[in-house]
Amino acid sequence: MSTGLPFGEDVNYWQTSKSSPDSWMEKTKRLILGLGGKVLMEGFGSEPASGRSAFMLAFEIKGDHFKIVWPVLPSRGRNEGAARIQAATLIYHDTKAKCLSAVVLGARAAFFSYWMLPDGRTAVEASVPELAKGIPAIFAAPQLGKGEVIDGEVVE
């Protein structure tokens, strides 16, 4: 099954760090805490049968809930360790940029793609369901069928 994701070797931060994925995730959590946020959940999941794996970080800032699910990119050379480090490094740098934006624009605007909708999907999962092909099914939110509608309220 093709995930549609690029190879890790073709993306920034490939084999640029010796730090463990855990250390990058700890740095990422400190960024969230620095904004006054609260980390709710974190995890790593993999599906040996499909080869898909991803990191997940769920957090709350000022009453809004967010969930980052970041795929580990496939490696041409099957270097899973380097791919995991790269994924955790990318999460950190993505979050760092969004935290800077949040200071000016607010957390919901900055982290909008990770904002949790009432049905449990994030804004990005709702708008680009194809991304679910690149992550383990355990982290993928259920997708709506054609014509289905979710009623829900946005809490301000």
Q: What positions do the PLM features span?
A:
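Alpha-helical structural elements
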Residues: 9, 19, 54, 65, ...
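Short, well-structured beta-strand/strand-turn elements
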Residues: 36-48
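Terminal, regulation- and interaction-focused segments at domain boundaries
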Residues: 1-30
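Long, continuous compositionally biased terminal/linker segments
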Residues: 17-20, 26, 48-97
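Intrinsically disordered, low-complexity regulatory regions enriched in serine/threonine/proline
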Residues: 1, 69, 73-156
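An amphipathic, hydrophobic-aromatic interaction surface with interspersed Lys/Arg
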Residues: 33
